Swiss-Prot record:
This is Ankyrin repeat-containing protein YIL001W. ANK repeats lie at residues 8-37, 41-70. Residues 122-179, 274-360 form the BTB domain. The keyword Repeat applies. Keywords: ANK repeat, Repeat. It holds the Pfam family Ank_4. SMART domains: ANK, BTB.
Length: 513
């Protein structure tokens, strides 16, 4: 079943690369689909985007791990089949040793945690052979290695500082790898053996395999290709591991409270090693507490701003850390805006593991919550789910979608609604809501630099042309034609009927546009 879903996602990815739908390409890549696979015609997503001239999509694919090696057949096809010189230059100049996921929001955030010393968010310290200290996040180490997780519970449980007999340069590379920092090209020949030993000791998935291959590869081009292939795999493994951590350690450690119930509970022995509690209240008034981590929640601008400025949450967090120490039983509490628990868990899966699996029935709630959290990428993904779900439009009114797009400023939804209205204009013509929508759109003119056009009307007219596959010049030619049979065959008469309906609505509203 999972393979069929992945095949479907890959087919959809190829289609979106042909059409240039960058938002959907972004969403589909986040499902874990292999960007370097090929379709039944032996076309890769990168080749399709290059061939069709979608430069932004080409750059996105390269940033997410797509490989373009001119020494390979597929890479040569991408370069020489590029529609524009700009795309060709981009492909030629892209160093395959840099073709990693460092610009992917998920990998970027995990990497940033390594250098973020703010607010005492790290909760474990390692002392290596020369006495140098390294700090890290317990939850991340537990997610990345079952052996590390076991040691946290057992032999390291009561240690504030864990001593390891390992060289500092080896442990530095090891930790950076766990934090998805691209350090593969920095590994020196004399470091391979100890890195293999350390990563094998803690059963770090794929790393010993890569290191063994890399140390036996002398050709720089081959080594760069190997790094590119494995860096993509490493990121996908990390996403999978963090998703398992969220499902097994966070969601299974939640505390449910009845409406307005207040009772003391401890998350001290929680396997998630949280440093904040996230409180969520659903529509029925039930409350659920999620053990979370500020280092991850701050990926959302809402929480980042909260702790960048001197809000009470920041003061409480720092005070709790200093007063009760690293192993505090009382941890600060943050509140998520009221929503269903399923929606909160979609948000958490996204923040922790970049998971974008959003069932259509929750897409609107996710969209609204993402807007509050100032998480624009998640807004885009949720809106993409809405516009591509047949079930959604069967359950929701298109005008509700339109008003939602205005409320939270998502152009994709606005265009979707206008296109739907244009396609179904003859069915919606007598619906009073269409007049209300146009009138509301006309009142938004002052927000759009005082123009004499109405945006919704302009969009409907545009999609009416698209509905009948016309260009503006075609309409001018048809207006001078007298052959009714011909005009009927090409669809011009139906087009005029639709345009007449739209003009009648505008006349009823006394709008001259």
């Amino acid at each position: 079943m999972a393979d069929k879903l992945m095949d479907k996602n890959f087919e959809e990815l190829c289609y979106s690369c042909r059409t240039g739908d960058m938002d959907n390409v972004d969403r589909l890549i986040s499902t874990g689909v292999n960007v370097n696979s090929v379709d039944k015609f032996d076309n890769s997503p990168l080749f399709l985007a290059s061939l069709c001239g979608h430069e932004a999509v080409v750059k996105l694919l390269l940033q997410r791990g797509a490989v373009c090696d001119r020494d390979r057949y597929e890479g040569a096809r991408c370069i020489y089949g590029a529609l524009t010189d700009t795309i060709r230059d981009t492909l030629l100049s892209y160093d395959i040793s840099k073709a990693v996921d460092v610009k992917q929001p998920f990998a970027t955030h995990i990497s940033s945690m390594y250098n973020d010393e703010g607010f005492l968010k790290r909760d474990i310290t390692f002392r290596v052979s020369n006495g140098k200290l390294f700090t890290a996040h317990k939850f991340l180490l537990c997610a990345r290695s079952e052996i590390l997780a076991e040691k946290m519970v057992n032999e390291w449980a009561k240690h504030e500082i864990v001593s390891l007999e390992v060289r500092p340069d080896i442990f530095d590379i090891f930790l950076k790898f766990l934090y998805l920092i691209p350090i593969l090209h920095q590994i020196e020949p004399g470091q391979y053996e100890e890195l293999i030993e350390l990563s094998s000791k803690f059963d770090i998935e794929l790393l010993p395999e890569f290191l063994d291959k890399a140390r036996h590869t002398a050709d720089p081009t081959e080594k760069s290709r190997l790094m590119s292939d494995y860096q993509y795999k490493f990121t996908e493994v990390a996403r999978s591991q963090l998703l398992i951590f969220v499902n097994n350690c966070i969601f299974r450690s939640t505390v449910d409270l009845a409406n307005s119930e207040r009772r003391v509970f401890s998350l001290m022995n929680c396997p998630a090693y949280p440093d904040v509690q996230l409180m969520v209240k659903n529509r029925n008034g039930a409350i659920r507490i999620y053990p979370c981590h500020l280092a991850v929640l701050s990926r959302a601008e809402y929480f980042k701003v909260m702790f960048t400025n001197n809000f009470k949450e920041k003061v409480t967090y720092i005070k709790a850390k200093h007063v009760t120490g690293k192993y505090n039983s009382i941890i600060p509490q943050l509140t998520l805006p009221n929503c269903e628990f399923e929606v909160a868990e979609i948000i958490l899966r996204y923040l922790y593991a970049d998971n974008t699996d959003i069932p259509w029935m929750y897409a609107v709630d996710v969209l609204l919550l993402a807007d509050i959290l100032l998480e624009d990428r998640l807004k885009t993904i949720a809106s993409t789910i809405i516009t591509q779900s047949k079930e959604f439009i069967q359950q929701y009114n298109v005008f509700d979608v339109l008003y939602l797009s205005w409320e939270i400023g998502v152009e994709r939804l606005e265009q979707f609604a206008a296109k739907f209205i244009a396609i179904h204009l003859q069915e919606l013509y007598k619906d009073p809501e269409i007049k209300r929508a146009i009138m509301l759109s006309s009142q938004r003119i002052s927000l759009r630099q005082e123009t004499d056009t109405i945006e919704l009307v302009d969009d409907i007219r545009y999609y009416l042309l698209r509905k009948y596959s016309f260009e503006p010049d075609d309409v001018e030619l048809f207006e001078n034609q007298d052959d009714l049979e011909y005009l009927k065959q090409v669809g011009y008469l139906e087009y005029r009927k639709d345009m007449g309906m739209l003009d009648n609505i505008l006349a009823d509203l006394e709008l001259d546009v």
